[in-house]
Swiss-Prot record:
Its main location: cytoplasm. This is Shikimate kinase. Belongs to the shikimate kinase family. Binds 1 Mg(2+) ion per subunit. The keyword DNA damage does not apply. Monomer. One of its GO terms (cellular component) is cytosol. Pathway: Metabolic intermediate biosynthesis; chorismate biosynthesis; chorismate from D-erythrose 4-phosphate and phosphoenolpyruvate: step 5/7. Keywords: Amino-acid biosynthesis, Aromatic amino acid biosynthesis, ATP-binding, Cytoplasm, Kinase, Magnesium, Metal-binding, Nucleotide-binding, Transferase. The keyword Protease does not apply. Catalyzes the specific phosphorylation of the 3-hydroxyl group of shikimic acid using ATP as a cosubstrate.
Length: 173
C-alpha cells in the first residue's frame, strides 16, 4: 500500500501540472486541488480577472493563503500556480508538508500548450509571449529547482506516463 503523502506539483504554465495532478490523484485515490481553480471558485471570477483587479502583490497574498490552507490537508495532490513559488512562505510550506515535483518544460512546449488559453491575457499578445516566458523562466526556474524533491521533464510524454513515472519514483518499495 502506498503511503498517501501530499504531492505538490510546481512548474511554469503549460507544464501540465493540472492534467498530471488529476492523473496522479486518480491513480492513488487522493483528493486533487488546483490553486488557480480554488481561487476562481472562492472569488467567483476567472483567474485573469482576479489578477488584473487585485494586482500581482494582492493576488500573491491571496494565493499564499489558499495554498497554506490546502497544504494543511493530508493525502492530497496540489497543482500550484506557476508564480506561487515566488513566496518564500509558500516554498517553505510546500517543502515541509509534502513531496514537491517540479514539472519542467521548454519555452517552445509552453507556447504550444498555452496558445489557445483565453484565461491568460499575456498569452494573447503573440509578439511578447516568448520573451515574457523566457523572463519568467529566468526568475522562477531556480526557485522551482531549489525546493523540488523530484524534477520531471514533461515535453515528450503523455500525462498518464508522467503520472506513472512520478508515482513509481516517489513511492519505490
Amino acid at each position: 500500500m502506498v503511503e498517501k503523502r501530499n504531492i505538490f506539483l510546481i512548474g511554469p504554465m503549460g507544464a501540465g501540472k493540472s492534467t498530471i495532478g488529476r492523473q496522479i490523484s486518480q491513480q492513488l485515490s487522493m483528493e486533487f486541488f488546483d490553486s488557480d481553480q480554488e481561487i476562481e471558485k472562492r472569488t467567483g471570477a476567472d483567474i485573469s480577472w482576479v489578477l488584473d483587479l487585485e494586482g500581482e502583490n494582492k493576488f500573491r497574498i491571496r494565493e499564499e493563503k489558499i495554498i497554506n490552507e490546502i497544504t494543511e490537508k493530508q493525502g492530497i495532490v496540489l497543482a500550484t500556480g506557476g508564480g506561487s513559488i515566488q513566496s518564500r512562505k509558500t516554498r517553505n510550506r510546500l517543502s515541509a508538508r509534502g513531496l514537491v515535483v517540479y514539472l519542467e518544460t521548454t519555452i517552445d512546449k509552453q507556447l504550444d500548450r498555452t496558445k489557445r488559453d483565453k484565461k491568460k491575457p499575456i498569452l494573447q499578445n503573440k509578439n511578447s509571449v516568448k520573451s515574457f516566458l523566457e523572463k519568467l523562466a529566468t526568475e522562477r526556474n531556480p526557485l522551482y529547482e531549489d525546493i523540488a524533491d523530484l524534477i520531471i521533464k514533461t515535453d515528450f510524454k503523455s500525462a498518464k506516463i508522467i503520472a506513472h513515472q512520478i508515482i513509481n519514483t516517489l513511492f519505490k518499495t
